[in-house]
């Protein structure tokens, strides 16, 4: 069976994906583990566009076709802002990865707005081979708070409120957050589709 190569060096992401896909008896490795150091520019207009670009770029770089390549792109989509921050989630305030500035800009943009519905979206693309690509999208719905709450997580987590749990992502225990997250939703879908693919072989 092939090995799944993850198009990321984010250790939290790597561990979460390994935990879920291990049920299929697949070996999962990160870029670091196979000695690849590459950044693919995320310049597509959709989460799926970025995920697909990353997965295909890496797949085409690798000579050893024993690898399937899994890539994802995710972010926050706010209804009243027309889907923003969207694909610009990580650089909403201009500087890439400045969560504090991004959260401040989001709060400023939503000042006085009553409709605070939003969702985290995770698009995943798994390139099995050039003729077989699995694409899925996971989501988790919530609302945008009026101030940051909680010390866990990262990014927009302190502002993302989930009414079922009456707390933000940043206030949740990591295991709870991971069990309901947009990434978990996408991974579960990938797992089911991959399971069907393996069974058909």
From Swiss-Prot:
Alphabetical list of InterPro entries matching this protein: dITP/XTP_pyrophosphatase, ITPase-like_fam, RdgB/HAM1
Gene Ontology cellular component terms for the protein in this record: cytosol
Function: Pyrophosphatase that catalyzes the hydrolysis of nucleoside triphosphates to their monophosphate derivatives, with a high preference for the non-canonical purine nucleotides XTP (xanthosine triphosphate), dITP (deoxyinosine triphosphate) and ITP. Seems to function as a house-cleaning enzyme that removes non-canonical purine nucleotides from the nucleotide pool, thus preventing their incorporation into DNA/RNA and avoiding chromosomal lesions.
Family note: Belongs to the HAM1 NTPase family.
Keyword flag ATP-binding: no
Coiled coil spans: none
Annotated keywords: Hydrolase, Magnesium, Metal-binding, Nucleotide metabolism, Nucleotide-binding
Free-text cofactor note: Binds 1 Mg(2+) ion per subunit.
EC number(s) stated in the UniProt entry for this protein: 3.6.1.66
Residues given in the record as Mg(2+) binding sites: 41, 73
Single GO biological process annotation from the record: purine nucleoside triphosphate catabolic process
Transmembrane residue ranges: none
A Pfam match: Ham1p_like
HAMAP family the UniProt entry points to: Non_canon_purine_NTPase (MF_01405)
Cofactor(s) essential for the protein: Mg(2+)
Protein's organism: Clostridium tetani (strain Massachusetts / E88)
Protein name, per record: dITP/XTP pyrophosphatase
Record-listed substrate binding positions: 8-13, 74, 154-157, 177, 182-183
Active-site residues, as the UniProt record annotates them: 73 (proton acceptor)
């Amino acid at each position: 069976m092939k090995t799944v190569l993850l198009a990321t060096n984010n250790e939290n992401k790597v561990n979460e994906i390994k935990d879920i896909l291990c049920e299929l008896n697949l070996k999962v490795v990160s870029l670091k583990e196979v000695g690849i150091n590459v950044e693919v520019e995320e310049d597509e207009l959709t989460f799926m566009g970025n995920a697909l670009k990353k997965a295909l770029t890496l797949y085409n770089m690798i000579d050893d076709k024993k690898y399937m390549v899994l890539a994802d792109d995710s972010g926050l989509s706010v209804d009243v802002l027309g889907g923003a921050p969207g694909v610009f989630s990580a650089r909403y305030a201009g500087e890439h990865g400045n969560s504090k500035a991004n959260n401040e800009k989001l709060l400023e943009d939503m000042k006085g707005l009553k409709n605070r519905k939003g969702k985290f979206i995770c698009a995943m693309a798994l390139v099995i081979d050039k003729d077989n690509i699995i694409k899925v999208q996971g989501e988790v719905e919530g609302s945008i708070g009026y101030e940051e709450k909680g010390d866990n997580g990262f990014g927009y987590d302190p502002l993302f409120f989930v009414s079922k749990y009456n707390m933000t992502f940043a206030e949740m225990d990591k295991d709870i957050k991971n069990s309901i997250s947009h990434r978990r939703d996408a991974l579960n879908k990938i797992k089911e589709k991959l399971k069907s693919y393996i069974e058909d072989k």
